[in-house]
Amino acid sequence: MENIKFTSKGITCSAWYIPTTSNKYKSSRGNPCIIMGNGFGGTKDTGLLHFAEPFSKAGFDTFIFDYRSFGDSGGFPRQNVSYKNQREDYHAAIEAVRSLPNVDRNRIALWGTSYSGGHVMVVAAQDKKISAVVSMNPATDGLAALTQICRYGGLKQLTVAVGHGLKDLAYSMFSKKPHLIPIVGQPGTAAMISTPGAEAGYKSMAGPTWRNEVCARTALEVARNRPITFANQILCPLLVQVGSNDQVAPPDAARKSADLASGQVELLEYPIDHFDFYSGSWQEKLLNDQINFLEKTLTPKQA
């Protein structure tokens, strides 16, 4: 595993590059590479190696990065989840990977989960050279997410989140320190994610650089983050993995996004909740499904 630095909008971002030791999918131009960013508030040391290392063993290079203001990357304010910035960071990571000497720049796949499961759809819609996309338990429609929050937490939950967001926005206007709220917490708390079981599920995979706090202003952005509106512009093969019991990322929105995509689409559904994707037998199952999809889409074409 190599430590890599790249820049996004002038800010230094940190990444891990894991070259495969296999020649299974190698072409004269190099190996295919999978670019991976984490979900809401996640860092590269939080659960991603459970996917990246099997990808590497299967024959794919992997590139895992921290978004600006998270983990080992630079950027201020710290812990600021901006879907626009994170999409830009994906684009910057793509350019960094395309410059790596042993990577086939024509066989790059994007992998995303939860919040980044939506990011990769948008980025692939914008960059037509992307070869494939894996979108796992994706958050594809912020409006649907707000509706779901009201369903499990009531209107009060949404009102509290907006109140914290406005407070943080006011702080930013007067150059005060950010107003932070938890990323994940128990039901009824002010955390951004507070569905039953979410706190235990998220914290079980937390890495050393992960912090359970986020700038509250992101609560004001959620409704505007709508990757579903880009879905019909996705031309490359797309794998969408949906949890039919997902309480965090609305499954109906993910299904609709898959239906709207213009290229080859595989929509796979599992009878699980959001954080069941990251461990246990279901993680093994859906990981195998991802590898099968990537084998089909990243195998070099015969001359």
Per-segment meaning from a language model:
Residues 54-74:
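Conserved alpha/beta-hydrolase
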Residues 268-303:
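Catalytic active-site module of serine/aspartate enzymes centered on a nucleophile-bearing elbow/loop
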Residues 1-30, 83, 279-280:
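N-terminal cap/lid segment of alpha/beta-hydrolase-fold proteins
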Residues 121-204:
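Alpha/beta-hydrolase-fold enzymes
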Residues 247-253:
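Conserved alpha/beta-hydrolase "acid-adjacent" motif
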Residues 234, 240-242, 246:
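Short beta-strand/loop motif that positions the catalytic acidic residue
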Residues 40-53, 67, 252:
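The serine-hydrolase catalytic nucleophile loop
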Residues 43-47, 70-105, 109, 281, ...:
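Catalytic nucleophile-loop/oxyanion-hole region of alpha/beta-hydrolase
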